Amino acid sequence: SCSGRDSRCPPVCCMGLMCSRGKCVSIYGE
């Protein structure tokens, strides 16, 4: 699942990324 997903983020954020403020960010904090 996508942690923090919102409508501004593409579905690819679900794959190893999460959504933060409309942008995809690494779940590892990079």
Curated annotation (Swiss-Prot):
It is found in: Secreted. The keyword Cell division does not apply. This is Conotoxin TVIIA. InterPro entries: Conotoxin_TVIIAGS (IPR012629). It comes from Conus tulipa (Fish-hunting cone snail). The lineage of its organism: Eukaryota, Metazoa, Spiralia, Lophotrochozoa, Mollusca. The presence of a 'disulfide through disulfide knot' structurally defines this protein as a knottin. Keywords: Disulfide bond, Hydroxylation, Ion channel impairing toxin, Knottin, Neurotoxin, Secreted, Toxin, Voltage-gated sodium channel impairing toxin. The keyword Electron transport does not apply. By structural similarity with conotoxin GS, may inhibit the sodium channel (Nav). No effect was observed upon intracranial injections into mice and intraperitoneal injections into goldfish (25 ug).
